[in-house]
Structures are given as structure tokens and as C-alpha cells.
Regions:
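Active-site histidine-anchored catalytic micro-motif
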Residues: 1-126
Length: 126
């Protein structure tokens, strides 16, 4: 089975449940991931922090109904490209084999705006 995100600012991972919650309301493993990425690829908080988006990207976005603020999500693109947008999971006797504690998680790194997201699940084989 393949679980895939259509969005270049999102990722799909397998991870276990952390059980404990951080003070931000995220599970502690999720918060740890946020903290690591914040150090490694800081959230874009000001124009010019990253080379992207350039003028041509902003013009393209405007032609497609996007606002300039929403284009300043380079951190989300970089984070997604490192983690990946899909996972492959073995199906054994009709059950996803994620190990004893594994779960599938969808991560939306784009903090510039809320929007509807799509995840595709495809079962391949028998």
C-alpha cells in the first residue's frame, strides 16, 4: 500500500504514538520534530529569509489566485522534500503491517494558510 500526499509542502510518515502531550498540544514526538526543523530549517518569518519565492514565482502565484503571503512557505517545501511525501506499507492478510506501535501520520508544514489537503492511498498487488 502506498500513502501519498499531492502537496509539495506536506509529508506522510510512519511513527509511533508518543502518548504524552507537549504544552503546545502536540504529541511530544511531533513537538520534537517541529523543534528540530525549527533549528535546521527555520519557519519563514520575513521576506528575503529564503531566496524563494522570487519575482517570477510571485507573478505565477498571482496569475493562479494565490496571495504573496502564501508564497512565503519555502520552509515547508524544504521540510517536505527532506522527509518525503509518501510511505509504502506492507499489507499482510488484509492488515497494514506497521509494527506493534507504528501509525501513519500526515504532516502539513505550510503555516501560511489553511486549506483542504488530499492524501491518496493505493493498494497494489493481490
Amino acid at each position: 500500500m502506498v500513502v501519498y500526499s499531492h502537496h509539495t509542502t506536506c509529508s506522510v510518515i510512519t511513527q509511533e504514538c508518543a502518548f504524552d502531550m507537549s504544552m503546545t498540544g502536540l504529541e511530544t514526538l511531533q513537538q520534537d520534530l517541529v523543534n528540530v526543523f525549527e533549528e535546521w530549517i527555520p519557519t519563514c518569518r520575513s521576506e528575503g529569509m529564503y531566496l524563494h519565492p522570487g519575482q517570477k514565482a510571485l507573478e505565477f502565484a498571482e496569475e493562479h489566485g494565490e496571495d504573496n503571503f502564501g508564497c512565503h512557505n519555502t520552509d515547508a517545501h524544504l521540510r517536505s522534500s527532506i522527509i518525503g511525501r509518501n510511505v509504502t506499507i506492507v499489507i499482510d492478510d488484509g492488515v497494514a503491517d506497521l509494527g506493534e506501535f507504528g501509525r501513519v501520520h500526515f504532516i502539513d508544514f505550510d503555516q501560511t494558510r489553511g486549506r483542504t489537503r488530499t492524501v491518496q492511498v493505493m493498494v497494489i498487488g493481490e
